[in-house]
A protein has these predicted regions:
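N-terminal subdomain of lithium-sensitive/metallo-dependent phosphomonoesterases centered on the IMPase/IPPase/PAP
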Residues: 1-90, 250-251, 257-260, 265
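Generic detector of well-ordered alpha-helical packing
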Residues: 48, 71, 89-92, 123, ...
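Short loop segments at secondary-structure junctions
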Residues: 110-114, 124, 133-136, 142, ...
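DPxDG-like acidic metal-binding loop motif
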Residues: 78-140
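Short loop/edge segments at beta-strand edges and connector loops
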Residues: 69-71, 141, 182, 228
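Residue-level signal for inorganic ion chemistry
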Residues: 24-27, 47, 58, 93, ...
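Short, solvent-exposed loop/turn motifs
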Residues: 115, 143-145, 231
Length: 265
């Protein structure tokens, strides 16, 4: 049955990201070999070690699933699979390099392009966020819900200050508490557990940055869309997403009122 399959996949993901996360935890605070995949896009030997361990743990258990990971060559065979593992071995690599405890190990399963199981693990703070389709979201095994905040003014948003303060906005944003975290998956998870009310990113992202947080926020009662209010679909031939906004339902709509008609470059 799908529900049992989704829950089994969630349990597998939480086990895998915890075990692979131990590799990142052991290397945290050291100086791993580091290079740039592209300008401003660093990767470390630890990213690759975590990726290899996740690949072993997950595909040994689910050999029929597709695979999409930031640190693996993209295999187009994933496009033929109903269920696909989507992985970010270390989301927030720069924070990891700088010894900031704001990185996460992320894994999700999609079914026909929709997330059905997810786990986001911060091995330094020992926060395990998880969800399965229709079964709710949890932080360290305890159910979580998004905040019920409905007003932007006075709310808590994870967003780049230069975005919220950009002069091109037709309307100035009201006073809010603005925060930041290196890992976008971590930002989404913090919305899911109501530490923040919303998260907005208007820069291009990859599927592996977003997909686990998408399910966790939704299962915590929130909404996840692009800036135009459209749901996100995964396992696409080009796994890029133009923008993402997540929040509780009421404040999400208030954000969309400001973003729905903007033109992104």
């Amino acid at each position: 049955m799908p529900a049992a399959e989704d829950s089994a996949d969630r349990d597998l993901l939480t086990h895998a990201v915890r075990e692979a996360g131990a590799i990142a935890e052991a290397a945290f605070g050291t100086k791993p070999k580091t290079w740039e995949k592209s300008k401003g896009n660093p990767v470390t030997e630890t990213d690759l070690a975590v990726n290899a361990r996740l690949h072993e743990l997950l595909l040994d258990a689910r050999p029929g699933y597709g695979w999409l990971s930031e640190e693996s060559a993209d295999d187009p065979d994933r496009l033929t699979k109903a269920r696909v593992l989507v992985i970010d071995p270390i989301d927030g690599t720069l924070a990891f390099i700088k010894h900031k405890p704001e990185f996460t190990v992320c894994a999700a399963v999609t079914d026909h392009g929709r997330p059905v199981a997810a786990a986001i693990f911060n091995p330094i703070t020992d926060e395990m966020f998880s969800a399965a389709r229709g079964a709710g979201a949890a932080l360290n095994g305890k159910p979580i819900k998004v905040s019920a905040t409905s007003e932007l003014e006075g709310s808590r948003m994870l967003v780049a200050k230069d975005v919220i303060g950009h002069p091109a906005w037709p309307r100035q944003w009201p006073p809010m508490t603005v925060g930041s975290r290196a890992s976008i998956a971590y930002r989404m998870a913090l919305v899911a557990c109501a530490q923040f009310d919303s998260m907005m990113s208007l820069s291009s992202k990859h599927e592996w940055d977003i997909v686990a947080g998408d399910l966790i926020v939704r299962e915590a009662g929130g909404r996840v869309t692009n800036h135009a209010g459209k749901d996100l679909v995964y396992n696409q031939p080009v796994p890029h997403l133009r923008s993402v906004i997540c929040a509780g339902p009421a404040i999400h709509e208030a954000i969309l009122e400001r973003t729905r008609d903007i033109k992104l470059p």
